Curated annotation (Swiss-Prot):
The UniProt record lists the keyword Cytoplasm: no
Function: F(1)F(0) ATP synthase produces ATP from ADP in the presence of a proton or sodium gradient. F-type ATPases consist of two structural domains, F(1) containing the extramembraneous catalytic core and F(0) containing the membrane proton channel, linked together by a central stalk and a peripheral stalk. During catalysis, ATP synthesis in the catalytic domain of F(1) is coupled via a rotary mechanism of the central stalk subunits to proton translocation. Component of the F(0) channel, it forms part of the peripheral stalk, linking F(1) to F(0).
Pfam families assigned: ATP-synt_B
Main location: membrane
InterPro entries the UniProt entry points to: ATP_synth_B-like_membr_sf, ATP_synth_b/b'su_bac/chlpt, ATP_synth_F0_bsu_bac, ATP_synthase_B_chain
HAMAP family: ATP_synth_b_bprime
UniProt superkingdom: Bacteria
Protein's name according to its UniProt entry: ATP synthase subunit b 1
Keywords from the named record: ATP synthesis, Cell inner membrane, Cell membrane, CF(0), Hydrogen ion transport, Ion transport, Membrane, Transmembrane, Transmembrane helix, Transport
Classification lineage: Bacteria, Pseudomonadati, Pseudomonadota, Gammaproteobacteria, Methylococcales
Topological type in the membrane: Single-pass membrane protein
GO molecular function: proton-transporting ATP synthase activity, rotational mechanism; proton-transporting ATPase activity, rotational mechanism
């Protein structure tokens, strides 16, 4: 093997190229690779964190939805109870009002009945007095008394 100046020049040039590459080219390449690796790792971590946060958000949303449904059901139940209470109150008020009206009507009927009885008593008294006057004005005759009383009975009946 023949070592000549060309081979020696090539070796020196190669060594200078390796040194230059190691000194000036290789560190920025390694730095770029490290930065890229770091960015990829950060991206994966961010994706994992985002996935975890999304799962937490879904859980929170599910819990909030369940709570909202429970609250809505409770509101509906309370509204139903209130409506039933209002219906019951209305029924009770209507029953009380009906009983009051019925009591007033009975009272009015009783008053009218008493008035009618009183009027009938007055008329019977007047007829009895009239009959007694007629009996006393006439002579005492049993046959006439019977006729007068029969006539009085017809007037009453």
């Amino acid at each position: 093997m023949n070592i000549n100046a060309t081979l020696f020049g090539q070796m020196v040039t190669f060594a200078l190229l390796v040194w230059f590459t190691m000194k000036y080219v290789w560190p920025p390449l390694l730095q770029a690779l490290e930065e890229r690796k770091k960015k990829i790792a950060e991206g994966l971590a961010a994706a994992e964190k985002g996935k975890h946060e999304m799962e937490l958000a879904e859980k929170r949303a599910t819990a909030a939805l369940k709570e909202a449904k429970d609250q809505a059901a409770e509101i509906v139940n309370q509204a139903q109870k209130r409506a039933n209470a209002l219906v019951d109150e209305s029924k009770e008020a209507a029953k009380i009002e009906g009983e009051r009206i019925l009591a007033n009507a009975r009272s009015e009927i009783d008053r009218e009945l008493e008035n009618a009885k009183e009027e009938l008593r007055k008329q019977v008294s007047a007829l009895a007095i009239s009959a007694a006057e007629k009996i006393l004005q006439r002579e005492v005759d049993q046959k006439k008394h019977k006729e007068i009383l029969a006539g009085l009975g017809k007037q009453l009946g």
